[in-house]
Structures are given as C-alpha cells and as structure tokens.
C-alpha cells in the first residue's frame, strides 16, 4: 500500500521517486494520482513530504484533484532556455528540470525513474541532466523493489475497484456465451440472420461494444481464438475465422478501468456443441 512507500524507499536507499508521463495508461503515475487527464506530467515522491506534481498550465484543475503540491511548467521559461542552448531542446528541457529540482531541494541522492515516456527523447534529456547535476544518481528500479512491493497489498478502495472490474468482465463473458448460443447452426458453423458465418471478428467487435457500454477499456485487445489459433500461445485470433462446432475456443479477456487503472484477467476454454479428443 502507499503507506509503505517511505519505508520501502529507505530500505532500498532511494531518496526520491520520479514518475514521468501521462496521467492515464501509465501505471506508476495512476497509482499515485488516480486516473487524471494529464497529457504529460512529472511526479516527485520524497519521503516525509507531500508528493510534488508538475503539470501543464492547461491541466491545472486536473492536477489539483490529486491533492499534491503543484508546480506548473509555465513557471519556467522553456523558450528562453531553448535560445540559451542555441535550439537544443534536449539540453533546454534538462535545464528546466534542473530548475525544478533545485526549487524542490532535490539536488543530490538516488532518484529512481518510473513512468511511460518515449524512451529516446527522455533518455537524451536524462543524460544531459545527469551531467548538469552530478550529485544526483538517476537510475531505475530494475528489481521493482518499491512500487511492485507496495502494490502487492491492496487497501479497501483498491479491492472494491478490482471487484467491480471482475463483475464487469464476467458480465461481458456471460454476454458472449449468450451471443454464441443465440445463433443458429448451419452445417458446423454458427450463422447470422442473413445466413453469413458468425466470425471471430464479429464476436470481438461485440465484446468491445459491451466493454465500452459498461465503462471499461480494452487497450491490450482480447484473445478470442478458435481451432489452430487456440493452440498457439497468445494468438489473439483471426478475425475472418468462422465460429464452428467442436473446435477449441480460447477466450482470455483482460480489460481495465477507463484511463488505465486496474485490470481484470479472466480465461475460459470453450467448445460449442461437443468436444473433440
């Protein structure tokens, strides 16, 4: 749980956590801020202090919902820094980060980097920043010894959210079964009202519609695979494949809360009509 973060940081010799990227579909950020409409942000978690969230000026109200100490990027003149560095955006961005870090008195110690960013540009900025601030050790939590450990234990709110996703997911699975069993059989295939085959693509389209209607997202797609595809690990299924009787169907669905919060993973293996050896 979040209450463990300070102790885990101390155990692992970390002076700060730096989480960068958007406020959605960015698990480390969402864990602290909740699902927030932040297109780009930086969060600094320092033991004994309220977390510090840097945000774009247009997203100040969204950032305020976090309850954290706020810093607007607009407080720093990036254009002036770009001119100062003769157009070197990477170095200018590093200089802005240096100003931010000095302002929050984070100028030395071990800083663990988390988050979801385009790795190339961010890596270049971090290289510049490391040279500008040599007393900082910018590194990664390769063993995931802090956030993974903290997230292994859930509080009641987290459990309620996971249960809600479980109920939603199993509702969609029930709907899927009803969809399949409501279709007529022609030969060994399920057919639609116009006589055309019901396909994997038809079923997955309907799954996505249900998930959207019930308030979830499906960013990782769904595995709904039949026949040979069902025997290939993590084959998501061929959209044009018809749904046939007696063929193995692997159904693995793992949607998440809107904005990329908690997921729920549910798997079933089906065979319609009868099961072959």
Task: Cite the ranges covered by each PLM segment.
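Active-site neighborhoods and metal-handling regions in enzymes and metal-associated proteins
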Residues: 1-277
């Amino acid at each position: 749980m979040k209450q463990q973060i300070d102790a885990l940081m101390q155990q692992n010799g970390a002076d700060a956590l730096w989480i960068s990227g958007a406020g959605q579909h960015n698990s480390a950020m969402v864990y602290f801020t909740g699902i927030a409409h932040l297109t780009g942000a930086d969060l600094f978690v320092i033991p004994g202090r309220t977390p510090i969230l840097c945000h774009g000026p247009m997203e100040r109200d969204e950032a305020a919902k976090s309850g954290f100490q706020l810093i607007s990027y607009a407080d720093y003149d990036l254009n002036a820094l770009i001119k100062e560095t003769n157009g070197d955006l990477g170095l200018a961005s590093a200089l802005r980060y240096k100003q931010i870090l000095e302002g929050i008195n984070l100028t030395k110690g071990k800083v663990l980097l988390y988050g979801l960013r385009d790795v190339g540009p961010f890596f270049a900025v971090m290289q510049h920043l490391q040279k500008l601030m040599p007393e900082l050790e910018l590194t990664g939590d390769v063993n995931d010894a802090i956030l993974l450990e903290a997230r292994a234990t859930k509080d009641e709110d987290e459990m309620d959210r996971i249960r809600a996703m479980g109920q939603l997911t199993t509702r969609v699975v029930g709907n899927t079964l009803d969809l399949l069993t409501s279709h007529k059989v022609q030969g060994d295939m399920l057919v639609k009202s116009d006589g055309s085959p019901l396909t994997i693509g038809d079923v997955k389209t309907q799954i996505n519609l249900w998930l959207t209607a019930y308030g979830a997202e499906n960013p990782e797609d769904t595995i709904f695979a039949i026949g040979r595809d069902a025997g290939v690990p993590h084959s998501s299924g061929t959209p044009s494949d018809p749904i046939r009787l007696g063929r193995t169907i692997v159904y693995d669905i793992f949607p998440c809360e809107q904005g990329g919060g908690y997921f729920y993973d549910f798997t079933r293996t089906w065979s319609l009509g009868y099961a072959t050896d």
